[in-house]
Structure formats: structure tokens, C-alpha cells
Amino acid sequence: MNSIASRPLLSGEDLDTAIDQARTELAGLLRGSEDIVGTGGQEAVAEARTLLAALLDRRVTEAAARMDERDGRAVAAARADRNEAIAVTGALLYWLSADEAAWPEVALTFGRLSYDRYTDPWPGAESPDPDDLDAACDLLLRGARYDDADERTTLYLFLALRDRQHLLACPNDAKALMTWGRRLLMFPDAGGLGRSSLHDMLEFEPFLVTAQ
């Protein structure tokens, strides 16, 4: 699965074509799954899932950046891509062992996509599903490494933990929220929240004050 990171970034029609090809490849492998014997065949399926999930994730990211919320078809397409990416990533995560090198990155992707679905900002969104929030918090916490986490991952973790703490106060979540909030403060823009605003949040949120 290391080869995925070395692939060039695609966009537009090239990305659409790559997704269609990845879907076809994965479907072919799954149709022949009864004939797949041994680790090599299973790894081929995992590789295909990894590629398809990465491509779908990229298309969702591109769509979100330019989304016209009045375009119902574009919104529906982005949601469908995100749901497919979650399903494919979930299947991959189920297959991987937690001690495999690829597991943390897959867990982070699944957690991030789950939080995006939980906080869906587009018109016609379904009610937020707490299961998505739990998946986001739990998998981001398991997949992230404090000293190595980038700004994006740290922001997702902070926001997901904050939202879950608002729903159901939990001492462990409050402590984790403080920890990752401090990590987010290490970045110049604090993930877009602004260091001053984040600092005030960490100082004055009632459930965080009690965790300090």
C-alpha cells in the first residue's frame, strides 16, 4: 500500500477516470474473491480499496472547496462519494491488523470522513449520527501520534472531541481535548481557529476548566 503515496495528484476528468477504473478493478477482484487464495490475493483487494478510498476522498475535498450549495446534484454527488469512501475505508480497516504500518493512516481517514459526515453543512443533510462522532473521536485518537500529528489531523481531533464533550461530558474526553488543544496551539493559525480564540476556548470552556 505504500505505492499510493507516490501516485501523482489527479483532478477533474483525470480524477473521474481514475475513480471509475479503481471501482472496476476492485469490483473485479471482489467478484473473484472466492478464487483468491493466500495473502497475495487479499493484499490486492486491500491495495484496490486503498486507492479507491484515496481517490474518492480527494474528489470530495475538491467538491467541498468549490461547492455551490444551490446545486442539488453536486451536493448529492459529493455525499455519495463520501459515503462510498467511508464504506471502502471501513472495509479496509476491518481487514487490517491494528499493528500493521498502514492502520493508523486508514484510521485517520475513516475518522476524518466520519466527522465530515457528522457535521455535513450542505442543504438537506440528515440529522447528525452520534455513531459518526464516536467513530471520528475513537479512530482519530487511536491513529494520531501527538508529536507527528499535522495541523489538519489535530484540528479534526480537537473539533470532534469538543462536539462529543458537548453531547456527553466525559473526563477522559475533556483531558484529551485539553491535550490536543495545546497541540493545536503550536501551529501558527491554530487550524484556522486563531491562536487567541483557541486559547480563550481552552481557558474558559466550563468542561475544560474542570479537566485542568
Question: What kind of feature is each model-predicted range?
Answer:
Residues 82-94, 126-142, 170-187:
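Alpha-helical repeat scaffolds
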Residues 15, 19-22, 29, 55-56, ...:
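The feature captures the hydrophobic core positions of alpha-helical coiled-coils
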Residues 39-49, 75-83, 130, 134, ...:
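Short, charged, amphipathic alpha-helical segments
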Residues 32-45, 89-105, 142-150, 186-194:
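Flexible helix-coil transition and linker loops at the boundaries of alpha-helical arrays
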Residues 1-7, 27, 43-73, 99-123, ...:
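Amphipathic alpha-helical repeat scaffolds of TPR domains
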Residues 19-22, 30-33, 37, 63-67:
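Extended repeat-based scaffolds of very large eukaryotic assembly and lipid-transport proteins
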Residues 2-25:
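N-terminal leader/linker segments that initiate helical-solenoid repeat arrays
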